[in-house]
UniProtKB/Swiss-Prot annotation:
GO biological process: mitochondrial protein processing; protein processing; proteolysis involved in protein catabolic process
Superkingdom in the source lineage: Eukaryota
EC number: 3.4.24.-
GO cellular component, one term: mitochondrial intermembrane space
Record-linked InterPro entries: Metalloenz_LuxS/M16, Pept_M16_N, Peptidase_M16_C, Peptidase_M16C_assoc, PreP_C
UniProt keyword list: Hydrolase, Metal-binding, Metalloprotease, Mitochondrion, Protease, Zinc
Name of the protein: Presequence protease, mitochondrial
GO MF assignments: ATP-dependent peptidase activity; metalloendopeptidase activity; zinc ion binding
Binding site for Zn(2+): H90, H94, E197
Co-factor requirement: Zn(2+)
Record function comment: Degrades mitochondrial transit peptides after their cleavage in the intermembrane space or in the matrix, and presequence peptides; clearance of these peptides is required to keep the presequence processing machinery running. Preferentially cleaves the N-terminal side of paired basic amino acid residues. Also degrades other unstructured peptides. May function as an ATP-dependent peptidase as opposed to a metalloendopeptidase.
Lineage: Eukaryota, Fungi, Dikarya, Ascomycota, Pezizomycotina
Cofactor-binding details, from the entry: Binds 1 zinc ion per subunit.
Length: 1025
């Protein structure tokens, strides 16, 4: 090695050492770029050094976390206690990102998405604060985004037209339509991105329960997201005043994380903050209601869950306070106490509340909430009958009493501490975002973030208290053995959605009558609204052609043409193919195995999710699930079994399906981990007298949350259902994890509850799956990620494990290569206030030359067509085009969309738009940058080698695709738009939402527990019983 190379290596190593060397930072009291150091601390167990500073001129708080991690993070948060339920913090979060003094373009936030290599960009409205974080590995990118974020939050333009677009407005559905000239009141509706987002949110019964619970226990803290009933009371003037009052450095907290220099950050941030004087900081901490005088009870109406029994429409929970979150050790201890009571099938709360049949699943607020100043422990149940609702609180209190009497086993506590040790060792790609999420909420509520980061200090103090005996029990006695609690109940009401619609109608009529008074007649009032809508459309369309030269951007030329190689090694162990990734893992080994099934019968495929749930629930002949859960926590970081589905990168429509098994542990515990995993898969006791009840309980858990799980990601469900009609591969995927799977599970539950014979048949099929689930065959493959020094020992362990596996192949079906007819125009009638859409078309395999241009096309359509047409003009929360290069699918989706018919028109015009547009070099470069955000994003060490192992995509394939992507031209984009979107093969579309008259020519289906109503995949349903 040359002398200058040695010097270079020494300097790099020295820089790394100094990065987390606490002495390399200014002393407490010293100043740097207008900031004064308040505190600094080295945290060796997290390999970081934290420095807390205060800006001299404004008193802005600043926390820097230095760590040898190239994925650097910035976040700025403001205390935003909501004054009412109009959603002003939420609407401000949206409009803040719509233009600023230095960057006066419309929507610089979304415009920066494709001008950056960030792997995380977002904004969050929390209960009492609003945060704007990003993460990137590129220093220039960091400085670009930091400049945009600082100007957006501290110098926003907050134009009234942006408020109307993002918040709420009243206007005709389509101001350009000829009938809009007639001025009919029924054609006028409420619009706005946030308004429609929150209408979508209250379609999610879990969200609605949680937010109404929060309003009851924290009435001093209004709904920050906004209630549609009150959003329409907010004015632009109120928004601007709220921003001036709250978005000030004196009311802010700044956080930076990673390996970039603190001094550089402070200079850039300080230059902006120096333009402000000292302002008012909102230091008020909102507290929950006073329960010192005894119990409180609140009951509110909610929607009916069509996937639950008609006589089990109650959701009820009870909440207790557990001290003060500034007591960091006690709050940590309360977290352990909560886990001991609630975590796992063997936990006392699960057994007393769900296994007993009192309800079907925990309420969404169940657990310990430490986001405010007062920690709150809530326990509750959904799917409860009116008669049983009062018994839930009694059952919870009995668990407290029994736990206090029996005490907590040391084995369970040690298992929890072992999980913490593994969490410290596990190298994640998004550690910095995790640091921000862990500290920011409590920081705004007066908790010192330095104490939150001092992991070992907290754990060691907990251990000291715990070793004295009876510590956790004393916390129970202190906080839970009393009746100072809130019981919150939501009752399913058949007219709930109709009442919301009626309330909206009344609000609309009131707004219109005010406009009639102002303009003299209804016709003139609606004409005025139409003119406003047309002006907004004009502004939106002008923005699509605006000069974006003021925005900073990275260059595609800065992206390396060479993909970073993370080499894998392949070997045969006992005739089984094994992929090895040897990397620094902090003494952990990660294991993954795939067992592929060829021509699997359809009825067994539909049962795979239930099988996976069962092996983690039923226990074995010699151990209960509680005992297994304790062992898993003591010996591993977790084990799992799940279905998999992967597509071939070289042949369209070719796929593999089967079961995958995974887990990780300390190197020394890998033999135990493999034995645990194998025993659970092969020896779960389906013949136990308790098995039938447990299986019904698992089916109820899934069906009870089905409507809410769809509402949370309806566009994905819509897309999967649409794609099911394109090929057998996508049809299989829909059976595994789509709406077909949800309906099949509901059918299974109905049959299990009404027919003991069908339940017995179901159990026999689960036993059949168990016989071939994990077996040593030519279809079994393994991946191991570990330290190079651990590979040999892991190979010895693996060989012994493989030798003990059974050798049974999965059954096949003669009909398995066929697929049932699936509609190419499906409409799922669901009780949501907004719509979700998915349009799918099959394209080419990953290695085809059109694959990379299709990905560029998807980015171009998202940012230049779908976002402005469907989100900005149409009011949907989101819209996107996406290319699945390995699956060979091109998709268009919308999310929380009030205007699905307009969206479908936009979708249908997408191909012609993309074909006829003369794409500029800037647009192409931005599209490529957007793709590289994902391609080059850091990955956690356990994911390394996974892409090759799962799908067979080699480094060489990825390298070729990368080069093709960098070389895509405008002509390439025009050509793939013509070939696939305009002239392409059959497209398939699916909508989810409330059925209207215009849906008559669609294939309308309904998901339901009721056999007479369920129309989704009826053929599949009959095969599952």
């Amino acid at each position: 090695m040359a002398a200058d190379d040695i010097v270079g290596c020494y300097q790099v190593d020295k820089a790394r050492r100094s990065l987390t060397n606490v002495e390399s930072y200014p002393k407490v009291g010293e100043q740097l770029h207008g900031f004064t150091v308040q505190e600094k601390k080295h945290v060796p167990e997290l390999h970081l050094t934290a420095v807390r500073l205060k800006h001299d001129k404004t008193d802005a708080d600043y926390l820097h976390v230095a760590r040898e991690d190239k994925n650097n993070v910035f976040g700025v948060g403001f205390k935003t206690n909501p004054p009412d339920a109009t959603g002003v913090p939420h609407i401000l979060e949206h409009t803040t990102l719509c233009g600023s003094e230095k960057y006066p373009v419309r929507d610089p936030f979304f415009k920066m998405l494709p001008r950056s290599l960030s792997n995380f960009m977002n904004a969050f409205t929390s209960a009492d604060h609003t945060t704007y974080p990003f993460a990137t590995t590129n220093q220039q990118d960091f400085q670009n985004l930091l400049s945009v974020y600082l100007d957006a939050t501290l110098h926003p333009l907050l134009k009234e037209e942006d408020f109307r677009q993002e918040g709420w407005r009243l206007g005709p559905e389509d101001p350009r339509a000829s009938d809009a000239l007639d001025g009919k009141p029924e054609d006028v509706l409420f619009k706005g991105v946030v308004y429609n987002e929150m209408k979508g949110q209250i379609s999610d019964a879990n969200y609605l329960y949680y937010i109404k619970y929060r309003e009851s226990i924290f009435p001093a803290l209004n709904n920050s997201g906004g209630d549609p009933q009150y959003i329409t009371d907010l004015t632009h003037k109120q928004l601007v005043e709220f921003s001036k009052r709250n978005y000030h450095p004196s009311n802010a907290k700044f956080l930076t994380y990673g390996d970039m220099p603190l001094s550089t950050h402070l200079k850039q941030i300080g230059d902006v903050l120096d333009g402000f004087g000292k302002g008012e900081a909102d230091t008020s901490v909102k507290l929950p209601i006073d329960l010192s005088r005894g119990p409180s009870n609140v009951t509110v109406p909610g929607p009916i869950d069509t996937f639950a029994d008609a006589d089990k429409q109650y959701k009820t929970s009870t909440s207790w306070y557990l001290g003060d979150t500034s007591e960091v050790v006690e709050t940590f201890s309360a977290g352990i106490l909560s886990s001991l009571l609630l975590d796992g099938y063997g936990s006392p709360m699960y057994r007393a509340l769900i296994e007993s049949g009192l309800g079907s699943s925990f309420t969404p607020n169940t657990g310990l909430d430490t986001s405010g100043r007062v920690p709150v422990l809530s326990v509750g149940l959904t799917g409860v009958s009116e008669e049983d609702a009062p018994k839930v609180k009694e059952a919870i209190q009995k668990v407290y009493q029994d736990s206090l009497s029996a005490g907590f086993s040391d084995e369970k506590v040690q298992g929890f501490l072992h999980q913490l040790e593994l969490a410290l060792r596990h190298k994640t790609a998004n550690f910095g975002i995790g640091v921000m999420e862990k500290t920011i909420s409590s920081w705004f509520n007066g908790v010192d973030p330095m104490k939150e980061l001092a992991w070992n200090d907290v754990i060691n103090e907990f251990k000291r208290r715990y070793q004295q005996g009876g510590y956790l029990e004393s916390l129970m006695q202190k906080y839970l053995m009393n009746d100072r609690c809130l019981t919150f109940t939501m009752v399913g009401t058949p007219t709930f959605h109709q009442e919301l619609d009626q309330q909206e109608m009344v609000r609309k009529e009131k707004k219109l009558s005010q406009l009639v008074e102002q303009h003299g007649s209804m016709e003139k009032a609606i004409s005025s609204l139409r003119e406003q809508e047309l002006q907004l459309l004009k502004t939106q369309e002008e923005a699509q052609h605006a000069d974006l030269g003021c925005l900073p951007s990275l260059r595609v030329e800065d992206i390396s043409r060479e993909k970073e190689r993370k080499p894998v090694r392949e070997s045969k162990v006992d005739d089984v193919d094994v992929v090895w990734r040897e990397a620094p893992t902090n003494g952990l080994t990660y294991f993954q195995a795939l067992n592929a099934f060829e021509d699997l019968p359809d009825d067994l495929r539909l049962l795979m999710p239930l099988f996976n749930d069962s092996v983690m629930r039923l226990g074995t002949a010699n151990k209960t699930m509680e005992q297994w859960e304790d062992l898993i926590k003591l010996k591993t970081g977790g084990v799992s079994s799940s279905a998999f589905h992967t597509s071939s990168p070289t042949e369209l429509g070719k796929f593999n399906e089967g079961l995958q098994f995974s887990g990780f542990a300390l190197d020394k515990n890998i033999p135990d981990m493999l034995e645990i995993l194998t025993t659970l898969i092969t020896e779960t006791d389906f013949t136990s007298p308790y098995a039938p009840a447990m299986i019904q309980e698992l089916l109820r858990l899934t069906t009870n949350g089905a409507l809410d799980s769809v509402a949370a990601s309806g566009h994905r469900f819509a897309l999967n259902a649409a794609a099911a009609g394109l090929s057998r591969s996508f049809w299989v995927q829909e059976q595994q994890s789509g709406l077909a799977q949800l309906q099949a599970t509901a059918n299974l539950l109905r049959d299990a509850e009404t027919s003991p014979e069908r339940l017995a048949e179901l159990i026999e099929k689960l036993r059949l799956i168990q016989s071939f689930a994990i077996s040593k065959s030519s279809s079994l493959r393994v991946r191991m990620v570990c330290e190079p020094s651990s590979a040999h020992q892991n190979e010895v362990v693996l060989q012994k494990w493989l030798a003990g596996l059974p050798q049974i192949r999965s059954p096949t079906s003669v009909d398995a290569r066929s697929m049932q007819q699936v509609s190419s125009k499906a409409f799922y009638d669901m009780p949501y206030k907004v719509y979700y859409s998915g349009l799918a078309m099959q394209t080419v395999p990953f290695v085809h030359k059109s694959s990379a241009p299709l990905s560029v096309l998807s980015q171009l359509l998202t940012h230049n067509y779908l976002h402005p047409e469907i989100r900005e003009k149409g009011g949907a929360y989101g819209a996107a085009a996406s290319n699945g290069p390995v699956k060979g699918i091109f998709a268009l989706t919308s999310y929380r969309d009030p205007n699905p018919l307009n969206t479908l028109k936009v979708f249908q015009n997408s191909g012609i738009f993309a074909r006829d547009r003369s794409w500029s070099e800037r647009e192409l470069n931005e599209a490529k940058l957007g793709i590289f955000q994902g391609l080059d994003a850091p990955v956690s060490v356990d994911e390394e080698g996974s892409r090759y192992f799962m799908s067979g995509v080699t480094h060489e394939m990825d390298q070729r695709w990368r080069e093709q992507l960098l070389d895509v031209t405008a002509r390439d984009v025009n050509e793939v738009a013509q070939t696939f979107l305009v002239d392409g093969p059959r497209q398939s579309v699916c909508l989810l939402g409330e059925k209207k008259d215009w849906a008559e020519d669609w294939d309308v289906r309904k998901l339901s527990m009721n056999a007479g109503e369920a129309e989704a995949y009826p053929e599949d349903a009959s095969t599952t019983a």
